[in-house]
């Protein structure tokens, strides 16, 4: 006799994924994250990492992490509101606030939990969130948890955003516009100057998730607010320590009063053990490196421009990308996954992205070049893209 504990309903859902050709297993990395990585015993050019600046295996970050373990141990031992708040946590937040040119910063365990915690702490029932339709899943989940009404506007469509703002103008206590700074699947940049003007016109709060802009846009990677010279005009900025910074964690930057409030009402902050000392120390060292020089961000953009232009010249559809995130849009889901598999056979790891991560018929292979890639790496990858693209009649 079958039991509910057999989880037959889950097995059926897994079978549906397999029949649709979109079932996947986790890739196992057998080396540090870098421009070339070892997967299944094979060295491949890595075009799927968020390690934009190559800091994840940087000797200065590793040294800082090791020294922190020797001094502080491997864990904080408690939430920060009890006895897990170490001096290095405070130091990291000071460094981040200076780097972002904001009054204060509060760190979280990830960018995902930062979005979930901040949104639900800032808005509530009787408020409204106005969210771009392509915002990250963590924003979507944060909106759901907040109990506020949510209105979606068409992606980067300022006319539609203004239409929504007019509709909600006198209906809510707090109005908050939320957007990614850089959109993770298409690589386009939010129209922040226009969003800020509309927010000021209609008395709305602005909230920007800079996960893919931190370390990428602006002076030495200070983010999208710096990129557009909007310091002091964006109310809430979310950042991550897990991508360009090369470590793990997330943070929110803004006014001191905002950070004080989140100290009291940011649930993931309140109920999760503090970031481990090694991660904190490595993040501090990453900020030090970025503050000293813009060499890594310049190399990142040189590589991104070169790779994107070459892909376009081969005939690939790279959509509306403006950043080191460059999608190769295939359309059909099974074909995108096959494209990814064949690239791996040619020594290139570039992840196939399918529904529900992207809309149906918009499947793609998403590439991210880094500052650590050499021109030889990129040329070898381009050769593989050309070969597989012709095999599958994509170009």
UniProtKB/Swiss-Prot annotation:
Concerning PROSITE patterns, the annotation shows: AA_TRANSFER_CLASS_2 (PS00599)
**Pfam family of the protein (one):** Aminotran_1_2
EC number(s) from the headed UniProt entry = 2.3.1.47
Which reaction(s) does its UniProt entry say it catalyses?
Answer: 6-carboxyhexanoyl-[ACP] + L-alanine + H(+) = (8S)-8-amino-7-oxononanoate + holo-[ACP] + CO2
Highest taxon of the source? Answer: Bacteria
Under InterPro entries, the record lists: Aminotrans_II_pyridoxalP_BS, Aminotransferase_I/II_large, AON_synthase_class-II, AONS_Archaea/Firmicutes, AONS_Archaea/Proteobacteria, PyrdxlP-dep_Trfase, PyrdxlP-dep_Trfase_major, PyrdxlP-dep_Trfase_small
- What cofactors are annotated for this protein? pyridoxal 5'-phosphate
The pathway noted for it is: Cofactor biosynthesis; biotin biosynthesis
The modified positions for N6-(pyridoxal phosphate)lysine read 243
Q: Which NCBIfam families match?
A: bioF, gly_Cac_T_rel, PRK06939.1
Subunit structure and binding partners: Homodimer.
User: Tell me, what does this protein do in biology?
Assistant: Catalyzes the decarboxylative condensation of pimeloyl-[acyl-carrier protein] and L-alanine to produce 8-amino-7-oxononanoate (AON), [acyl-carrier protein], and carbon dioxide.
Name recorded for this polypeptide: 8-amino-7-oxononanoate synthase
Q: Which species does this protein come from?
A: Thermoanaerobacter pseudethanolicus (strain ATCC 33223 / 39E) (Clostridium thermohydrosulfuricum)
């Amino acid at each position: 006799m079958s039991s509910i504990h057999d989880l037959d309903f889950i097995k059926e859902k897994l079978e549906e994924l397999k029949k649709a050709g979109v079932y996947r297993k986790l890739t196992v990395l057998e080396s540090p994250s870098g421009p070339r990585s070892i997967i299944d015993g094979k060295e491949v050019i890595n075009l799927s990492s968020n390690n934009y600046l190559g800091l994840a295996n940087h000797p200065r970050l590793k040294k800082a992490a090791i020294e922190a373990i020797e001094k502080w141990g491997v864990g904080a031992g408690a939430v920060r509101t009890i006895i897990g708040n170490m001096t290095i946590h405070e130091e990291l937040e000071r460094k981040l606030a200076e780097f972002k040119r904001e009054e204060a910063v509060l760190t979280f365990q990830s960018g995902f939990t930062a979005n979930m915690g901040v949104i639900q702490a800032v808005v509530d029932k009787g408020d409204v969130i106005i969210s771009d339709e392509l915002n990250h899943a963590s924003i979507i989940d944060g909106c759901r948890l907040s109990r506020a009404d949510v209105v979606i506007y068409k992606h980067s469509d300022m006319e539609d955003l203004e239409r929504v703002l007019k509709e909600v103008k006198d209906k809510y206590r707090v109005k908050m516009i939320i957007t990614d700074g850089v959109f993770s699947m298409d690589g386009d940049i939010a129209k922040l100057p226009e969003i800020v003007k509309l927010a000021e016109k209609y008395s709305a709060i602005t909230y920007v998730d800079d996960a893919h802009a931190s370390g990428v846009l602006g002076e030495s990677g200070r983010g999208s607010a710096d990129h557009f010279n909007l310091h002091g005009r964006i109310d809430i900025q979310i950042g991550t320590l897990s991508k360009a910074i090369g470590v793990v964690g997330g943070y929110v930057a803004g006014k001191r009063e905002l950070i004080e409030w989140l100290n009291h009402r940011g649930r993931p902050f309140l109920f999760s053990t503090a970031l481990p000392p090694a991660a904190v120390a490595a993040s501090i060292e990453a900020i030090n490196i970025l503050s000293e020089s813009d060499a890594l961000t310049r190399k990142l953009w040189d590589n991104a421009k070169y790779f994107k232009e070459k892909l376009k010249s081969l005939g690939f559809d790279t959509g509306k990308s403006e950043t080191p995130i460059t999608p190769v849009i295939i359309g059909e889901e099974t074909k995108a996954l096959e494209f990814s598999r064949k690239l791996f056979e040619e020594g290139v790891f570039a992840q196939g992205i399918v529904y529900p991560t992207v809309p149906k018929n918009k499947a793609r292979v998403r590439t991210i070049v880094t500052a650590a890639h050499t021109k030889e790496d990129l040329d070898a990858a381009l050769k593989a893209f050309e070969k597989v693209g012709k095999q599958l009649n994509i170009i």
